[in-house]
Design a protein with these regions (language model features):
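Short, low-complexity disordered leader/linker segments with a strong preference
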Residues: 1-47, 349
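Transmembrane alpha-helix boundary/anchor motif
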Residues: 31, 144-148, 195
Length: 349
């Protein structure tokens, strides 16, 4: 492990001093630096914050914790990363802003809230692109596509270290969906995302943006008929208790990015950058494995409750894709053509 140069050490000290008020205000200050500005014989040790807006028992948190663990192991304990969950350091938007400023170097979060900051990430809002998670992961890992997406993050002030997932987003509802016509009129809660709203409108549904904290009561009081989320969210928040069906629309992958402030990353010695990259690769593989196992477990929980899981026919999926062409065109108009073409390469349009 290389020792920091004086310039690099000064940068790190300044950054840690900047983040101290943020952590202190939250009552969780744990950043530690020893050996700063001391003799060459002393060892540099440091603890950097990594923040998520997700609860602890989620793939997002598993991804974050595994990255921190691997970074520590690969550096023989010299690189310490402290993970803070449950929006302790802020919500999704807050975390993106503080990461961009360099106050919190690491963030793990879903790509959806990042579209407001980096419009090219709307490529991940293209509906019903993949037939399987394996196909989706192969595309994400494809060198040419990954390079293009990495550039998007770099231009936004971040460095993309890895991208895992929480499976596909699926629909839960109190009205069975066995054909395309069955989507018509369903009051479904969505995120406040124009492309998501347009997708459900194209299916004939009645999408309603709603705070996630209101979804359970909305289903209970029949303000809404349905909602859409990954299996993990549906089970961990007990949404299936208020629903008769889960429909495997698999309309979007729920992608989880691991990002670091770009300037912060570039200031690291080369060997530490390599450790970060390797740790992220290992964490990505682990998070995907955990996601698959947890999805199977969540499906079992839903079935045991009596809620029926409906798998759509190829014909219905084809109708959904056909109805979504307007969404494709809307997204295609606002993102880099190279990104769109790379993402859709090998996909029948």
């Amino acid at each position: 492990m290389k020792r920091f140069t004086t310039a690099t050490t000064d940068i790190k000290k300044r950054r840690i001093l900047r983040v101290v008020p943020v952590l202190a205000a939250a009552g969780i200050l744990s950043v530690v630096l020893t050996g700063c500005g001391s003799s060459d014989e002393e060892v540099q040790r440091y603890s950097w914050p990594l923040a998520t807006a997700s609860p602890e028992d989620t793939v997002t948190q598993i991804f974050a914790e595994k990255f921190a663990e691997e970074a520590s192991d690969l550096s023989n304990g010299k690189m310490k990363i402290q993970v803070y969950a449950n929006s302790t350091l802020g919500g999704d938007r807050d975390l993106l802003e503080t990461c961009s400023d360099g106050d919190i170097p690491f963030v793990v979060q879903n790509t959806a809230p990042q579209v407001s900051f980096m419009s090219d990430l709307a490529v991940f809002d293209l509906p019903c692109v993949f037939d399987s998670l394996d196909d989706c992961r192969k595309k994400i890992d494809e060198p040419d596509f990954y390079s293009l997406i990495s550039d998007v993050y770099t231009n936004g002030g971040y460095h993309l270290l890895g991208m895992a997932d929480q499976g596909f987003r699926v629909m839960s509802t109190n009205k069975a969906v066995n054909s395309f016509a069955d989507f018509k009129g369903q009051k479904i809660r969505t995120m406040e995302n124009s492309y998501h709203l347009a997708f459900w409108k194209a299916l004939g549904a009645n999408p309603t943006p709603m705070s996630f904290s209101e979804v359970y009561i909305g289903l209970q009081q029949h303000t809404i008929d349905a909602q859409e989320n990954p299996y993990e969210v549906i089970v961990s928040n007990n949404l299936y208790e208020q629903q008769d069906y889960v429909v495997e629309t698999n309309h979007l992958p729920h992608l989880i990015s691991l990002i670091v402030n770009d300037e912060f990353f570039k200031d690291l010695p080369e060997d530490e950058q390599e450790i970060m990259t390797e740790a992220a690769q290992l964490a990505t593989e682990y998070a995907r494995e955990q996601s698959d196992a947890r999805i199977a477990d969540k499906i079992a929980t839903i079935k045991e409750s009596g809620t029926e899981i409906i798998t759509l026919s190829d014909e219905t999926r084809k109708e959904i894709r056909e109805a979504s062409k307007g969404v494709y065109e809307s997204i295609r108009e606002v993102i880099d053509p190279a990104i769109y073409n790379s993402y859709m390469d090998g996909i029948e349009e």
